[in-house]
């Protein structure tokens, strides 16, 4: 009987551990409709979000918008697009700020706040859960 309870507890812990991963939906990297571009590559997004470039290839200024640490969208974006953990990102920006080479992207609280800022500012680029994308923004990159 004890063995069966241990198995059930172990299974419950496993399911709780995996549930955030299973709940992560597709993401969309979005831009203001007036931004002069139709798509971005993963490498371009990487460079923008790590502050390595502040302008698109056509010369347009770009302002990356991040989400708060701990959000599912942020975790998926950094894992799948930037290929870095929250710890690695924090260390990266600490180094960059300390050496005076830049500042991290501005942060918004959630998907909706990111989308609202992108709609209001023609230079903003953000990532959101694909389910909230509508015709007020354009998708320039998709993450499955």
Residues covered by each model-derived region:
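Short secondary-structure boundary segments
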Residues: 2, 25-26
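Exported/periplasmic ABC-transporter solute-binding proteins
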Residues: 26-144
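Bacterial N-terminal signal peptides that target proteins for export
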Residues: 2-12
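Short, linear, compositionally biased motifs with a strong N-terminal bias
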Residues: 15-17
């Amino acid at each position: 009987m004890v063995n069966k309870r241990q198995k059930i507890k172990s299974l419950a812990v496993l399911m709780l551990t995996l549930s955030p991963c299973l709940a992560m939906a597709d993401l969309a990297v979005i831009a203001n409709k007036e931004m002069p571009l139709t798509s971005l590559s993963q490498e371009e997004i990487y460079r923008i979000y790590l502050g390595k470039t502040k302008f698109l290839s056509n010369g347009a200024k770009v302002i990356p918008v991040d989400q708060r640490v701990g959000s599912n969208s942020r975790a998926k974006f950094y894992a799948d697009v930037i290929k870095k953990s929250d710890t690695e990102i924090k260390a990266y920006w600490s180094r960059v700020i300390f050496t005076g080479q830049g500042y991290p992207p501005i942060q918004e609280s959630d998907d909706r706040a990111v989308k609202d800022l992108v709609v209001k500012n023609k230079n903003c680029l953000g990532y959101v859960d694909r389910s909230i994308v509508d015709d007020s923004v354009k998708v320039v990159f998709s993450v499955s």
